[in-house]
């Protein structure tokens, strides 16, 4: 599919929110590190999740697919030291989580990928490799990382403002090493919510880590993961698209959301309420955001970078000025998301100025429409689809298939909510 052509209309109806990609990554990893059989249910087989499944299989996990379930047995994880190739596709989570895991025992591994993945920072791990004399080589731009050796317990100093994925990768790994370890966070920690997800999942699988106010993490060695059955909860980062559409006037009931979730992207509710939208709890695990008199605000992107593109859509149609701050990390995602969402929404008639680490958005009453480009980024494509609900004319989105990275059923769900689109 080269493009979708959307006729502007309000979305109406109920939608089952897809399972959390963040939680699924973590559950698959913990189950694969457990000695015994786990069943992980409510899986959405997006490209990123498939990359993590295949990566853990390469490391020795036995993973069987039964409909939306995974039967995982980690008895043979890292049992052999044969050369391994792990294809991360475009998944930053797969790459950064599995690099340290692959070094639990002496190993020789080649990580490959595509798209923008090779441009995303890995210096945190390179510094650890050098300190521990782990051999490594890599190619600039394209992801082709070769590593050889094993990780040892001890003290790890990690910056908290690059990516929380490095910290999560170490949190998965260090409990399985012989010696005790300590992770010291040397800067302000961004995306704390993702660390909470990791700690919660690790604890569910029987591993204990002491969190000293996110400044350091104390990890006893020689622990083991215990198999369990786990159902993946609904994804707030995907619900954010429908919440935003609701704030802009659509009427959508979002199903399968855990109100007690640790997901950091749940913050989208608080942000939208702060702008003037209203939250309606329809029934258990069912939420709607209702349109209100929307006003500009200040949005700190440091703790919830993934929902910034669609919140920019809402801000573009709110009264007054909205500032997106602390968003420099959005430049090193699947694309430069600050530039992409600014460029494409301005094509539709928005008034957005791009800054080094954020955006200044002056709200307009309506968007016009036109042809835009997804930048092959799933969150940009879905954000532009939500923007179309408030356009006067058709919106043409080029390269829409990129949604398969995280939400393969997005366009079908969009149509099920009375979205009017045709594919070419």
UniProtKB/Swiss-Prot annotation:
It comes from Clostridium perfringens (strain SM101 / Type A). Its main location: cytoplasm. Transmembrane segments: none annotated. It catalyses: 3-phosphoshikimate + phosphoenolpyruvate = 5-O-(1-carboxyvinyl)-3-phosphoshikimate + phosphate. Catalyzes the transfer of the enolpyruvyl moiety of phosphoenolpyruvate (PEP) to the 5-hydroxyl of shikimate-3-phosphate (S3P) to produce enolpyruvyl shikimate-3-phosphate and inorganic phosphate. GO terms for cellular component: cytoplasm. Monomer. Pathway: Metabolic intermediate biosynthesis; chorismate biosynthesis; chorismate from D-erythrose 4-phosphate and phosphoenolpyruvate: step 6/7. It is an enzyme of class 2 (transferase). The lineage of its organism: Bacteria, Bacillati, Bacillota, Clostridia, Eubacteriales. The gene is aroA. This is 3-phosphoshikimate 1-carboxyvinyltransferase.
